[in-house]
């Protein structure tokens, strides 16, 4: 499959994942989003899969933690450009954990849904705990 189509699938499925949370609460989209990520992780070469996972994460986190722009801009006094830059930087950091998921899935050629779940839970635990964590979203 063309890598640009894979990138598009990853980005769109990442953005769709945001709609599983409040205020939208379309909880079924969480499954669609994760299935898009797993599809990318299993059907792509390592470099393509890692970049696609980065795009998935940026779509998921940039839109999901967009509320931080209000905090940084209105209450922190930073310019809007700085606010968007900081949220993008945070999203890029948070992308490391789904990228670790993709790396582990490819490294160990995971085929079992249970092992997918274990690896995902492990990387989410790290995201919520490591360096004081960021468990939201």
Please tell me what each predicted stretch does.
Residues 1-137:
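Membrane-embedded alpha-helical bundles of multi-pass enzymes
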């Amino acid at each position: 499959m063309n890598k640009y189509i894979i990138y598009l699938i990853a980005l769109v499925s990442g953005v769709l994942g945001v709609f599983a949370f409040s205020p939208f609460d379309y909880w079924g989209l969480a499954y669609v989003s994760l299935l898009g990520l797993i599809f990318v992780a299993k059907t792509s070469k390592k470099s393509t899969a890692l970049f696609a996972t980065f795009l998935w994460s940026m779509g998921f986190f940039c839109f999901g933690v967009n509320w931080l722009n209000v905090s940084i801009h209105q209450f922190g006094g930073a310019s809007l450009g700085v606010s968007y830059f900081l949220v993008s930087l945070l999203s890029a950091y948070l992308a490391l954990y789904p990228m670790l998921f993709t790396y582990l899935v490819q490294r160990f050629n995971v085929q079992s849904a249970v092992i997918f779940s274990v690896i995902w839970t492990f990387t989410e635990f790290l995201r919520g705990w490591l360096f004081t964590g960021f468990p939201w979203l």
